[in-house]
């Protein structure tokens, strides 16, 4: 399976390193639309959503990602990636990809200094607690029909799935746990 990490900004290397640990995965850093269109799955990493959103438009990557979604290719957005996927952003008038029926709040847990780690129990993902790293993290304020809430932290939605789309407010790539990767890759079957 050919799995790409959108390689324009953010935690690209960390996602690539995790994918390389999974047997049968060809990890690809996707920096152009031609590469994007060859993928069996795509991860949109954390970073700065406004900067990534601008790059998506300026380099024609947005249309390629929208085509992947039309083909029901699994797409996973972590942190900023989740913001980019959201149909609505509460504290920002921009709409980037708008492919997932969620409403998110950017920097919901505060600034960089308010970043934190915690452990979450997410039965759909793992029988064990999962470490979750939140860095200037968003959260999901509401979900539309057909969106499955996977995890909450202090009453706020921090992980969700809608068909082929997965979104996490936190950074699984910064932990040793591959559970979210394995779950994501099963969306392709």
From Swiss-Prot:
GO terms for molecular function: glutaminase activity; pyridoxal 5'-phosphate synthase (glutamine hydrolysing) activity. InterPro entries: Class_I_gatase-like (IPR029062), PdxT/SNO (IPR002161), PdxT/SNO_CS (IPR021196). It catalyses: aldehydo-D-ribose 5-phosphate + D-glyceraldehyde 3-phosphate + L-glutamine = pyridoxal 5'-phosphate + L-glutamate + phosphate + 3 H2O + H(+); L-glutamine + H2O = L-glutamate + NH4(+). GO terms for cellular component: cytosol; glutaminase complex. The keyword Metal-binding does not apply. In the presence of PdxS, forms a dodecamer of heterodimers. Only shows activity in the heterodimer. Catalyzes the hydrolysis of glutamine to glutamate and ammonia as part of the biosynthesis of pyridoxal 5'-phosphate. The resulting ammonia molecule is channeled to the active site of PdxS. HAMAP family: PdxT. This is Pyridoxal 5'-phosphate synthase subunit PdxT.
């Amino acid at each position: 399976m050919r799995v790409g990490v959108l390689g324009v900004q953010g935690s690209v290397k960390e996602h690539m390193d995790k994918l390389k640990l999974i047997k049968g995965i060809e990890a690809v850093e996707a920096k152009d639309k031609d590469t994007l269109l060859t993928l069996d799955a795509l991860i949109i990493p954390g970073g700065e959503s406004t900067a990534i959103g601008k790059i998506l438009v300026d380099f024609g990557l947005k249309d390629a990602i929208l085509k992947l979604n039309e083909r029901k290719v699994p797409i996973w957005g972590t942190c900023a990636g989740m913001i980019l996927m959201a149909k609505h952003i509460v504290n920002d008038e921009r709409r980037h990809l708008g492919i997932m029926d969620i409403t998110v709040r950017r920097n919901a847990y505060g600034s960089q200094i308010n970043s934190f780690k915690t452990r979450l129990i997410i039965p759909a993902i793992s029988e064990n607690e999962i470490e979750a790293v939140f860095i200037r993290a968003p959260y999901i304020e509401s979900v539309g029909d057909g969106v499955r809430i996977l995890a909450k932290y202090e009453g706020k939605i921090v992980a969700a799935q809608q068909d082929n789309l997965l979104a996490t407010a936190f950074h699984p790539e910064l932990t040793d746990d591959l559970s979210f990767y394995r779950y994501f890759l099963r969306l392709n079957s």
